[in-house]
């Protein structure tokens, strides 16, 4: 292990890395169930998507482990699978095979961007204050995800102010989009699941503040045990034979390679009238994939040594390898039959637990692979156990805001929009877009447009085009 992952050089050991890997896996294992449920709405077989999710996650995460030697895990991105289902398939009318073809092309575009060093140029073009804001923004995003997953929030929606997209009258497969009338509020703490989440948060705070070794994982385990005794997790309801590996493999055969088949790439460019929509969808896929990854790497890169505290690149070779690993996951995932694979922001939970090398990623990859045989085991760990970890890690990441000069509005305004919009829009990419656009706007107002890097001007234009496509198509 020492020879492969250079543990001593990174100030870590096997026990810490394994603990970090377990922490990251349980923080993101929800994707094993959420992704198949979401993509199945397009007509894809859920059990096949379950295996495709694992294949994409394992491929990308193993690349992170052995090629990049970094503690990042990959899996199909949540925002990306929602865009795949509700926008590309439901709203734009493409088939799931064509949507998979778009995802594959997104991987190819990412390869070109990475090989030509464009991704590295993007990172280097971002001002130090914005990098700090991106780090803090990911903290806001993580904390919000944790608070929501713990069940601490409720949302009230006024009648006739929302739209429903989904499969006919089946509300279980519907997506509800509300206007600004949707108002968040605090739940009444009288639900066992919410109470367990609150207890889990207290346990996590205790272990982490006390500096107990392996406290993050211990918090997850203790809270899970409490959830079982509280009836939040019903072991008796778990059907260990419901989804056998044999039936999953059979369903995988229906979607594996569909992206490159006659109903995928073969049809995608057949109708010239649809080309504008195709190109804009691919652009949206690519922008989101690129900036979800870049945002995560910038947000956590200082701790693992790929982004220096000055905001400049410290080990560009490791950073490049992380970016290559990401695109490999997307390409293989698309061929297997899932939406874009991206570097997971939940990796921050494992990094917070001490993960510093690819051994953390290897543990995550192995656990994903094992999940193909024992998927019910993964479902035992409730959101109430993992959500508190996301909240605490988010709090710790907010410390990056101290690097922002709040007296200088040219720094403060973009930093505010970057960090806050990540949580409010539930998207790392949209937070970055808000920061980039407001940064450029402030510079123009101050007569300092020449200080804006050329790459940022290009990205501003691409973000604006993406927002226009969202409004038009």
Outline where the language-model segments fall:
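Helix-loop-helix hairpins and the membrane-proximal interhelical loops
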Residues: 1-48, 220-319, 463-465
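Residue-level signature of catalytic and energy-coupling elements of molecular machines
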Residues: 18, 38, 122, 214, ...
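Helix-loop-helix junctions within the multi-pass membrane cores of secondary transporters/permeases
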Residues: 2-35, 56, 77-86, 90-138, ...
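Membrane-embedded alpha-helical modules
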Residues: 92-222, 229, 360-473
């Amino acid at each position: 292990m020492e020879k492969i992952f250079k543990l001593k050089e990174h100030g870590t050991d096997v026990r810490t890395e394994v603990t970090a890997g377990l922490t990251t896996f349980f923080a993101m294992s929800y994707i094993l169930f959420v992704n198949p449920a979401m993509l199945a709405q397009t007509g894809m077989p859920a059990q096949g998507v379950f295996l495709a999710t694992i294949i994409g996650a394992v491929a990308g995460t193993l690349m992170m482990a052995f090629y990049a030697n970094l503690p990042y895990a990959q899996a199909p991105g949540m925002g990306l699978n929602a865009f795949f289902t509700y926008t590309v398939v439901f709203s734009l009318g493409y088939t799931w095979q064509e949507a998979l073809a778009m995802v594959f092309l997104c991987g190819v575009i990412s390869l070109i961007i990475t090989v030509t060093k464009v991704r590295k140029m993007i990172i280097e073009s971002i001002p130090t204050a914005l990098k700090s804001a991106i780090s803090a923004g990911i903290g806001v995003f993580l904390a919000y995800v944790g608070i929501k997953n713990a069940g601490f929030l409720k949302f009230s929606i006024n009648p006739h102010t929302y739209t429903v997209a989904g499969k006919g009258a089946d509300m279980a497969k519907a997506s509800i989009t509300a206007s600004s009338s949707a108002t968040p509020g605090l739940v009444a703490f009288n639900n066992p699941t919410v109470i367990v989440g609150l207890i889990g948060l207290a346990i996590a705070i205790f272990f982490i503040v006390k500096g107990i070794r392996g406290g993050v994982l211990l918090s997850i385990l203790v809270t899970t045990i409490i959830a079982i005794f509280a009836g939040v997790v019903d072991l008796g309801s778990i059907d260990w034979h419901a989804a056998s590996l044999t039936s999953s493999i059979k369903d995988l055969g229906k979607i594996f390679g569909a992206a490159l088949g006659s109903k995928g790439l073969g049809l995608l460019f057949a109708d010239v009238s649809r080309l504008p929509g195709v190109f804009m969808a691919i652009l949206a896929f690519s922008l989101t994939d690129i900036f979800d990854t870049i945002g995560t790497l910038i947000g956590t890169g200082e701790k693992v040594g790929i982004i220096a505290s000055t905001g400049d690149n410290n080990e560009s070779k490791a950073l490049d390898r992380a970016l290559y690993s990401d695109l490999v996951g997307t390409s293989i995932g698309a061929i297997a039959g899932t939406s874009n694979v991206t570097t997971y922001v939940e990796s921050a939970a494992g990094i917070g637990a001490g993960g510093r090398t690819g051994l953390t990623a290897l543990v995550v990859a192995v656990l994903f692979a094992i999940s193909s045989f024992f998927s019910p085991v993964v479902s035992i760990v409730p959101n109430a156990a993992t959500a508190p970890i996301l909240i605490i890690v988010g709090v710790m990441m907010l410390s990056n805001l101290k690097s922002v000069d709040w007296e200088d509005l040219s720094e403060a305004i973009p930093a505010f929009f970057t960090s806050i919009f990540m949580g409010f829009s539930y998207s790392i990419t949209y937070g970055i877009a808000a920061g980039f656009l407001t940064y450029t706007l402030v510079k123009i107002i101050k007569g300092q447009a020449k200080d804006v890097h050329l790459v940022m001007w290009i990205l501003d234009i691409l973000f604006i085009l993406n927002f226009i496509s969202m409004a038009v198509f």
